[in-house]
UniProtKB/Swiss-Prot annotation:
Pfam families: TIM21 (PF08294). GO terms for biological process: protein import into mitochondrial matrix. Gene3D superfamilies: Mitochondrial import inner membrane translocase subunit Tim21. Essential component of the TIM23 complex, a complex that mediates the translocation of transit peptide-containing proteins across the mitochondrial inner membrane. Required to keep the TOM and the TIM23 complexes in close contact. At some point, it is released from the TOM23 complex to allow protein translocation into the mitochondrial matrix. It is found in: Mitochondrion inner membrane. The gene is TIM21. This is Mitochondrial import inner membrane translocase subunit TIM21. Component of the TIM23 complex, at least composed of TIM23, TIM17, TIM50 and TIM21. Residues 98-229 are mitochondrial intermembrane. Residues 32-76 are mitochondrial matrix. One of its GO terms (cellular component) is TIM23 mitochondrial import inner membrane translocase complex. Residues 1-31 form a transit peptide.
């Protein structure tokens, strides 16, 4: 017996004894019940994809138009954040190179000037042991010497020559002093040259470690790390 015949037999048996006027109504209810019992259960309904909850697990083909737009928005935002991160990383790298690691940076010139001061016999005689000579920038509320900024300026004159000028404080076991530095990179040259580097110590004569007039008499100097010595 096929399913249709079986359904008819069942219906005729179920409606036996029911008034004729009620049979059409009961038949429709009975059919709906039978259809519901025979239906295949659906799987759990998935959550709608938005730019804030999309994890990429739902395949692209199963997304609606709105969900595809949401995923595209999320991916565009993520790509933009990656670009911003790369730009910030490049900016930090450029800053570190120009201000710290480059041979022409202020930090490099400051460190070389301090090394020259510590190794000069006249400075050692006036200020004391070279190993105990320290240099730092302007006084601040910070007790750490290394955190005190060194006053400096970089300019380019009308002829295209680059100038670096700075002053900082030098402390030794015997005395304290103030150092001043002026360096020039002439247009068309690749190295900075000292115009002057001197230290003023109270009750002592100014000590010149570099002076353009005196250095020019000594002929051409050796160039290393972007500075002529």
């Amino acid at each position: 017996m096929n399913p249709t015949t079986n359904l008819l037999v069942t219906r005729s048996t179920a409606f036996r004894g029911v008034p004729t006027t009620l049979r059409p109504f009961l038949a429709s209810r009975y059919y709906a019940t039978q259809q519901g019992l025979g239906a295949t259960p659906r799987g759990p309904k998935r959550r709608a994809v938005t730019p804030f909850n999309d994890n990429g697990h739902v395949p692209w083909k199963q997304l609606s138009v709105a969900e595809k737009a949401a995923r595209a928005t999320q991916q565009s935002f993520n790509f933009g954040m990656i670009l911003v991160g790369l730009m910030l990383t490049g900016g930090v790298g450029y800053f570190l190179w120009t201000d710290v690691f480059s041979p022409d940076s202020k930090i490099s010139n400051f460190n070389r000037a301090v090394d020259k001061i510590r190794s000069d016999p006249r400075i050692i005689d006036v200020m004391g042991d070279s190993k105990k000579i320290a240099a730092h920038g302007d006084e601040t509320f910070n007790k750490w010497r290394r955190a005190r900024p060194v006053a400096s300026s970089e300019t380019t004159d009308a002829r295209g020559d680059q100038h670096i000028m700075m002053h900082f404080y030098v402390e030794g076991p015997k005395n304290n002093g103030v150092a001043r530095l002026h360096m020039i990179k002439y247009r068309g040259h690749s190295d900075f040259e000292y115009k002057y580097l001197f230290v003023d110590v109270k009750d002592h004569e100014r000590i010149y470690l570099e002076h353009e007039d005196s250095s020019s008499k000594n002929g051409k100097k050796f160039s290393l790390f972007g500075v002529k010595w």
